[in-house]
Amino acid sequence: MEQKVKEGYRVFTVGEMGISNTTSSACMIGAFNHWNAIEVTGRGTNISDERLKHKIEVVQKALDINQADPDDGLDVLAKLGGFEFGCMTGVILGAAANRCLTIIDGFNSTASAFVAKKISNVSIQYLMASHLSMEQAHRRSLEKLGLSEYIDLDIRLGEAVGASIQKKILDMALTVYRESMTKEQVQADGSN
């Protein structure tokens, strides 16, 4: 992280690749917020009703068996998360330590944002949500973090797709801000 900051990077995006990661995310977000499996579990990659029922059972069983401490981000991560969630959490914390922005992607990176917030509450000040995922608990999760999505494209992907789109929107907004003439400059130039 420090090397990238030295190279001039100030904005980072996080996302993940995998199958069934929304199951872990549901467990983690459920643990942090004292939500049961029905409240927090969604369809992921658009699974059937039968698979959703099974997924809800798995999430509730994981919550019941592991009894992760909702006040301890590392405990929740260790008991209910996985390597990819640890990596995203590390990026969020590293960026915040360097006063850099991290744009989180969907439901899965939101779970990592909860871990980061429990480890260092200040990390939330350096987070931007990108999009609203299709997971039923995503909006409510963002609200718990004090974040709002900027785009809603019905995305079911977590590979930093939404975060990359949001980064481009941010880049365009900054370009317009930096390169547009002010009203005073336009009047002085005589242009309309």
Each model region followed by its residue ranges:
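N-terminal loops that bind phosphate or other acidic moieties
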Residues: 1-192
